[in-house]
Amino acid sequence: MLLYVNSVNASDPLANLDCREPGLVANGVFDQRSVDDLKSYRVLRFLDWSDANGNPASVTWAARSVPQRLVQDGTDGIALEHMVDLANAAGSDPWFTVPWNADEGYVRALGKLVHDRLAPGRKAYFELSNETWNYAFPIGNVVLNEGLARNLSPDRYSNNLLRYAEKSVWFHKLLTSAFEDNPARLVRVLNLQNGNGSGIDQMMNFRDTKQWVDAIATAPYFGHSLLRTVNVGVTDLPTLFASLETMRAQTIELAVSDKASATKWGKRYLSYEGGQHIVPPAASADVAMRMQRSPLMHDIYQRYLSDWKTKVGGTVTLYSATGAINQYGAWGIREYAGQPVSETPKRRAVLEAIAANQ
């Protein structure tokens, strides 16, 4: 909802406006229905709330978002206090994706805030930036150029991985200091492209990286080529889902390999994102939408999560909790808040998998 105010009476201005629905807690920050929707999830990754993909040029504690700010538009996205408080309210472990250019003061203060504010018994996951290996994001070339400037490797593109490892060690050392009284609450994450075991080895072999990392995370997505280079122009859903199933199975096998690489280094293996990755050309937008809403999508997510449990194990974080279907994909496991579970094939499969594991 947008409310435009064109003029006010200076002697009797607008005051105490409250746009929340009647019946909600007057001093509440979160809609309890949204909190309840998140309670099933053990880990909440605050990627989009952190603006890490926006790669702000400067991220300082002085310029950060604070809860009192009407518009949450600081260089670090939504206020960290809101992230911690939502995780506490949902009974989940928060996962913080911190912008690449966060300075030392910011990282130290972040660690202290999370350490002090997070509910007892909860773990905090931290990763520096998001998909620095992915040259589709501006951060990919930023990290590559920093690595090249430091001459970290004779191989051009290895400079990206090694610079990410180098700065992640700096980042995780600061956080380790903040949690030194209870290190078991801290999970220090490196993220990497799914199926890149050699990249894992490169980073773990680089200087003392392995001493400052607890977990390796990848994004086991499937279906990126569907309707673009595979089954172009096809509209028959069973045919499309047969191809998607092949891609799903291949992605799980890559995750199995990545877990083996992480285990070799004594590290946990996690999924930082995952699920279907169908981004159709405009001509196939309608059939892609039908796929997202099809019962066959529920079935493929069932198999995806079942295979993850039996072949991989550990934490799988899907992207994302809520998101509309548009030309950029269909990332949400539901399309809007409050959507009936019966209309959300992906979310229904997720909730069924969670219930089966309780």
What are these model-derived regions, one by one?
Residues 111-113, 190-217, 277-286, 325-335:
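Substrate-binding cleft/loops of secretory-pathway carbohydrate-active enzymes
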Residues 72-77, 98-108, 194-200, 224-225, ...:
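Acidic-and-aromatic substrate-binding clefts and catalytic sites of carbohydrate-active enzymes
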Residues 29-93, 308-317:
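Catalytic domains of carbohydrate-active enzymes, especially glycoside hydrolases
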Residues 1-40:
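Extended acidic/polar, glycine-enriched regions
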Residues 30, 124, 154-270:
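Noncatalytic carbohydrate-binding groove/subsite architecture in carbohydrate-active enzymes
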Residues 58-75, 141-164, 226-246, 282-293:
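A solvent-exposed, charged loop/short amphipathic helix patch at secondary-structure junctions
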Residues 42-46, 94-96, 122-130, 186-190, ...:
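Hydrophobic faces of well-ordered beta-strands that scaffold small-molecule active sites
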Residues 285-299, 303, 307-308, 317-358:
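Aromatic-rich peripheral "rim/lid" segments of glycoside hydrolase catalytic domains that contact
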